[in-house]
Amino acid sequence: MTGVQVGSFASTGHSHPPDLIWRVVGGEPRVRTRAGTTIIETPKNHVLTELRSAPPSRQAVEDLVQTDRPGVITLADGSGLIAFVPAWSGQRLYWAIDDDIVLLSTSARSIAGAVGPRLNRNSLAATLIGTLPLGISMRLSPWSGVHAAAPFEILHVDHSLAAHLIPVAPRIDPIADDEAIEEGIAQLRKSLMEAVHYRIRSSAAVTCDISGGVDSAANAYMLRALHRGFNVTRARAHSKWNLDDRWAERIVNDLHLPLIEYPSIGSTSFAYDATSPYAYGNVPETPINWSDTEGYVRSLARRRNRHARIQFTGLGGDELFSALPALAWSLVRELPLSSPRMAIRYCLNYRIPLRRGIPSLANRTGYGEHLEQCLRDLAAHGKTPDDQLAWTAGAVSFPSCMSEEAKRLSLDLPFDPGGIQPLNRDRTVHQALESLLGQANITRQLNDMFPESRTTWTSPFLDPRVIRAALAMPMRMREHPFLNKPMLYKAMRGFMPREIFARTTKGEYTSESYNAIQRDRGRLLRDLAGGALADLGLVDPKKLKTRFSMKLLSSEFLFELQRFSAVERWVRNVL
């Protein structure tokens, strides 16, 4: 659907305030109903029965925020307008107020078209910082005059058109009793199987990506356990020594399934492409960070589908089941009696001096305070300390080829970072939730950019029930001396071989990245030094040429180039 849907709420109070008018710009056809004195407007294909039977309560709204339905949901009563986008949909809520009308959408570009499309240089500059904390980047809009709400935030607009955001932290009920662990594993297993079954309930054909890793393999074994026929796809590794290939072959042979192979990820990568149009002309809402696998995705999308198809991926598995950077911080709080021994072991294992490791483990800095300190360190030193146990693991630093003006612009934010609340008080759970939201956004981008392929990309590890079940498990379930992802192993025990979890090595793809940059080196320098970002004053061409003149490019610079290429390409496609 194009155009806008218009709604209003006229108060019956004696003061007769003006009608509050809102418009949902773009998106799907919508339906409006009433529950008591409340107007409820939702996407037509996602009828919300929870709000039909009775006037919506705050609890009902909070429950809906944590689902994965797409689209803007609006509710209006005498107190004003409430709008939100379910967090796990992978979409975000954007809004603007124009001529006393509240414009809402999951597309910032649609609103920008209504209020005047001007790129926001501050947001673009911040987007160039690949290590920028997600708590900041999720609240940025690439268009001037358009505001963004982070996932798990509800927008409230009153009759005076004053807008404010209400955070709604996701509910995670941790299992504290050891006797309840087996029950928790059973619940995780049930949630995983139900998530897969829900996704294959239609008559659509099913394909499953097998990369050689644990998560994609788990998808395949769950599909087999549900007696659903499916095909297997994978991209060959560039090197014959890459063990992912060997493990993928073992899994496919064990399942006795037809395999569809594609060229290696590196040979079809768009990681260092700053000029190509997007597939089918579908420009994403924000620059993509998966351009290294875009060629593989395009190959999958080009397959001729007579019928709809479901494509399973392993996105989200690492966040749910792996040992995340802040795990040691969480463990010393989960097992306080063992914390001295764990603290010493952590410092020894990672070769960190006790005088630095112990304060990091004991640190109780709040999330908003941490974000403020990050920005102060960036302003003063151009980088932050490399603390793996902080809310945002690792160092945050300005890219080496970023202009001085861009550095200044990136720190001028339209909100107070000190007031941002964490998604969970536990740092590991918070890190997992933030990263999972990023994976949900990738899945949404895949589906938005390739609708012509009639393929729906999905992952059971991004199902809200699976997320709640996995993150409720004790943190110590993420560690095991001999197994990868021991929590997932326990949930899959009985229909997935133990050997897959006992794998001691991971695939190596660094050489593919170096091959790709060597292939595109000269062209990329020209595209970036004389491109849109340089015209906007966000990239320093002299610094770029100096770095490119070096014979060997560092891995850090390669990551910078991937980010610069993604943003440059996006800007060229929207201008």
Task: For the regions a language model picked out, list residue spans one by one.
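Low-complexity, flexible helical/coil segments
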Residues: S110, L119-N122, S137-L140, D244-D245, ...
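Active-site-proximal helix-loop elements at catalytic-domain edges
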Residues: S53-S57, R171-I175, E179-A180, P277-V283, ...
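Alpha-helix boundary/capping detector
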Residues: R109, R121-A125, G130-S141, A218, ...
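Short loop/turn hinge sites at secondary-structure boundaries
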Residues: A60, L64, G130-L134, G281-E285, ...
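Adenosyl-5′-phosphate
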Residues: M1-L20, V146, R306, F312, ...
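Cysteine-centered catalytic environments shared across enzyme families
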Residues: M1-F270
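Short, motif-level signal for alpha-helix interfacial/capping segments enriched in acidic residues
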Residues: T67-P70, T293-G295, G438-R444
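ATP-dependent adenylate-handling active sites, centered on carboxylate activation for C-N bond formation
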Residues: S79-I82, G90, I172-R408, D448-F495, ...
